[in-house]
């Protein structure tokens, strides 16, 4: 067979963007037949998102109807479902619809989440809850990702061209694939105790180097800073003891009560062996109940709804 590799290709000009994703239109479905099987995806959402989802669900339905995707909001089970219909012509739009409901469940506002239906937009939900076992350390590192007044997060958004939302045990990101890769690296390293400022400096240098065409085919590692991890032991503050001089008394200290004396005083001494065991069990159960109530209150703090701006529905 004759090779066509070295032949002239007059249609292949430099102004053609070969990486551009062409929009899939209805006429591109040559057969015109509906899909052989129905595809559907379902995701659960937390209780505090219920009121917000009810207010925006008409807009969600309207946005998905343009792509012939059906959606169902089940407030009893706390779930959102998307599925293809007989009119659906784009085989990949169901995956975009799945990402839409996933972002809505993770507290992403609807005006931002609906952009995922565009071809040039992708998303990534990064789980950060499993990196650190200590709750206080986890909260500290998550706050480090946000930064003072959200400055660290804004810098990352500008450098990666992604929308980033930190919520609970996840970080939701939307943007191009190249930016999402950088966001995941920064977030995971931050939870591994590597400060985001190091990555921000690196991304700023890369952005400046990308403006110079003569460095397009060169290795940039010589321009990037190399940070060494240093574990410096902190000096522990000296404990100052408050030693007060005791007043001298010639009399010996009073004798401490024995265990039997305490039992006689409380009346436990006169109980039978079985009654003592029952009393001990009841005390243990009361302590367990108190601990369980404290744990439930601690867990409930994670499900407090974040402050959101009031959503104004689209009148058009």
From Swiss-Prot:
Keyword Ribonucleoprotein set for record: yes
Further details from the record: Present with 4340 molecules/cell in log phase SD medium. Cold-sensitive mutant KRR1-21 is a deletion of amino acids 234-239.
Domain KH: 122-192
Pfam families, per the entry: KH_KRR1_1st, KH_KRR1_2nd
One Gene Ontology MF term: RNA binding
Main location: nucleus
GO terms classed as biological process: endonucleolytic cleavage in ITS1 to separate SSU-rRNA from 5.8S rRNA and LSU-rRNA from tricistronic rRNA transcript (SSU-rRNA, 5.8S rRNA, LSU-rRNA); maturation of SSU-rRNA; ribosomal small subunit biogenesis; rRNA processing
Top-rank taxon, per record: Eukaryota
Quaternary structure note: Component of the ribosomal small subunit (SSU) processome composed of at least 40 protein subunits and snoRNA U3. Interacts with snoRNA U3. Interacts with MPP10, KRI1 and with ribosomal proteins RPS1A, RPS4A, RPS4B, RPS8A, RPS8B, RPS11A, RPS11B, RPS13, RPS24, RPS25, RPL4A, RPL7B, RPL8, RPL23, RPL25 and RPL28.
Family in the record: Belongs to the KRR1 family.
Biased composition (Basic and acidic residues): 279-304
Subcellular location: Nucleus, Nucleolus
Keyword rRNA processing tagged: yes
Gene encoding the protein: KRR1
Consequence recorded when altering residue 207 to G: In temperature-sensitive mutant KRR1-18; grows normally at 25 degrees Celsius but fails to grow at 35 degrees Celsius
Record's keyword terms, sorted: Nucleus, Ribonucleoprotein, Ribosome biogenesis, RNA-binding, rRNA processing
GO cellular component: 90S preribosome; nucleolus; nucleoplasm; preribosome, small subunit precursor; small-subunit processome
Function: Required for 40S ribosome biogenesis. Involved in nucleolar processing of pre-18S ribosomal RNA and ribosome assembly. Essential for vegetative growth.
InterPro entries: KH_dom, KH_dom_type_1_sf, KRR1-like_KH1, KRR1-like_KH1_euk, KRR1-like_KH2, KRR1-like_KH2_euk, rRNA_assembly_KRR1
Annotated region (Disordered), positions in chain: 279-316
Gene3D superfamilies associated with the record: K Homology domain, type 1
Name by which UniProt lists this protein: KRR1 small subunit processome component
